[in-house]
Amino acid sequence: MDKVMAQLEGLVAHYEELQEMMADPEVINDTKRYMEISKEEADMREVVQKYRKYKSDIKEIDDNKEIISTESDNDLVEMAKEENSELEKEVAELEDEIKILMLPKDPNDDKDIIMEIRGAAGGDEASLFAGDLLRMYEKYAETQGWKVSLIDSEPTEVGGYKRVAVMITGDKVYSKLKYENGAHRVQRVPVTESQGRVHTSTATVAVMPEYEQVDIDLDPKDIRVDVYRSSGAGGQHINKTSSAVRMTHLPTGIVVAMQDQRSQQQNREKAMQILKSRVYDYYESQNRDQYDAKRKESVGTGDRSERIRTYNYPQNRVTDHRIGLTLNKLDRIMNGELDEIINALVLYYQTQQLEKMAEENA
């Protein structure tokens, strides 16, 4: 904890500098700079407040120890001992909270995401399960106050999806859904199964942060653009002009379709923004050395082929294989109640990071 405390002293000094800057008329008049400083100050506020409380409690404990060792009044001594008993519990809790707050932040945690779900092994049943997963995430997004927008889809005749991509926007979306990367396995009796046998199918989920400003230039020659009429439910055309846009990045095969915006130009701009995000994420993922090391320290590799979770319908059971968590409430989880799983994954990640921090400070 000593190394962490040394870091905290520097952090508090920087926090106080930020507060002084926020009172500077020159900064106040520069809206962009003021907003940047204000956000940095807000991000640091909780850990600074807890550290100040921690230091205050330590001082109070020391003062009480002085009373205990020198005071002749037994009542005062007992009072000091009782106070220290409570303060020491509070200090231990504050230490744990401060350690978690001092963990390295994932720079993408505040970002919106692009989620792609694909029916994998299992044919029609896999495509149906891909649709079930999409609805699960849509319901979870609703509980979080997030917005889900369709980017592109490839529906199947049975009512599922061979592939569907959505954008999910809101507060800290990536921080919660980044753990969904991987292969999701389902065990259930398909609606087409006459013998009542349980089949196993899989769908893969890929979660990518959406980058508002991506430092990547795409060669126009590498992009094929198709325009077509927007279509609504059941495939009926809802727009007489060709306002929908599909962009294909030929070197990677990444496809983005956009029809949510009001005009073809707006659809082009949004499609290009999403395409840049996805191509950027694709090339970032090619450099796997550092990427894999980071992901393995947290929860698995995040590879789409890695089986992360099994949904067993006959037994109403969901198992997350990365952390060995089993919950007998599949019906509620498929209805969007994902918090218990996500919170357990976050805790697992934090515990691993804390263990690493302890080794470094040993």
From Swiss-Prot:
Subcellular location: Cytoplasm
Name listed for the protein in its UniProt record: Peptide chain release factor 1
Mod. after translation: Methylated by PrmC. Methylation increases the termination efficiency of RF1.
Any single Gene Ontology cellular-component annotation: cytoplasm
UniProt modified residues of type N5-methylglutamine: 236
Entry similarity comment: Belongs to the prokaryotic/mitochondrial release factor family.
GO molecular function terms listed in the Swiss-Prot or TrEMBL record: translation release factor activity, codon specific
PROSITE patterns associated with the record: RF_PROK_I (PS00745)
Xref: Pfam families: PCRF, RF-1
Protein purpose: Peptide chain release factor 1 directs the termination of translation in response to the peptide chain termination codons UAG and UAA.
InterPro entries (UniProt xref): PCRF, Pep_chain_release_fac_I, Pep_chain_release_fac_I_sf, Prokaryotic/Mito_RF, RF-1
Gene label: prfA
Domain of life: Bacteria
Database matches in SMART domains: PCRF
Disulfide bond is among the record's keywords: no
